[in-house]
């Protein structure tokens, strides 16, 4: 679908430069009134130029911060254990008076999640550890995050593991590379979380949100 691809391209490639660079470019394009636009990246525009520019105009304004303090909790879960942690952390975030947006990365659109992260004040990334690594959907999401856009956001990682649990420290390192504020060593449990683990996950979510 053309518009779905156009939106995906905007979110992952153009979005980080939406203000002021994209807005200035749109203004210049409208002043020049070109019959064709040949960008250095992306499709050539030879029809529907005004429609595309209008869409870009609107999308440039979509990343205004959420009115209430918000934490995006984006996760992938192999056996449901990391999902249980995510749900409890969301409860804890809400206990602290903040909003929690839960995204299962196997179902949610990457562009939608990235856009929500751009508007939120906090981010929790969740993944189990398989073959000593976090799972691909989480890494795919981080490829749409940029220091220029997301630096300074409060962020951490969590997950269930069976053996060595490298997913959480690997994700924390990526969050630091994005120049986000990483306040701790994340949260991880071995295999299926116990009731004590779930209570601790809820408390972790609350403590995290109180730092926003």
Feature names for model-found ranges:
Residues 53-59:
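Membrane-embedded alpha-helical bundles that constitute the cytochrome b-like, heme-associated redox core
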């Amino acid at each position: 679908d053309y518009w779905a691809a156009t939106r995906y391209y905007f979110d992952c490639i153009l979005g980080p430069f939406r203000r002021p660079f994209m807005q200035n470019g749109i203004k210049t394009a409208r002043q020049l009134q070109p019959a064709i636009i040949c960008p250095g990246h992306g499709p050539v525009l030879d029809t529907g130029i005004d429609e595309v520019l209008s869409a870009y105009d609107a999308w440039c304004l979509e990343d205004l911060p959420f009115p209430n303090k918000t934490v995006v909790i984006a996760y992938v879960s192999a056996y449901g254990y990391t999902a249980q942690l995510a749900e409890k952390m969301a409860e804890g975030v809400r206990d602290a008076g903040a909003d929690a947006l839960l995204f299962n990365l196997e179902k949610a659109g990457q562009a939608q999640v990235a856009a929500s992260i751009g508007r939120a004040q906090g981010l929790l990334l969740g993944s189990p550890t398989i073959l000593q690594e976090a799972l691909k959907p989480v890494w795919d999401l981080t490829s749409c995050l940029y220091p220029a856009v997301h630096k300074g956001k409060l962020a951490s990682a969590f997950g269930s593991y069976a053996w060595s649990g490298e997913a959480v420290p690997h994700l924390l390192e990526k969050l630091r590379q994005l120049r986000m504020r990483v306040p701790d060593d994340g949260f991880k449990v071995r295999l299926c979380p116990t009731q004590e683990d779930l209570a601790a996950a809820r408390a972790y979510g609350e403590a995290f949100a109180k730092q926003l």
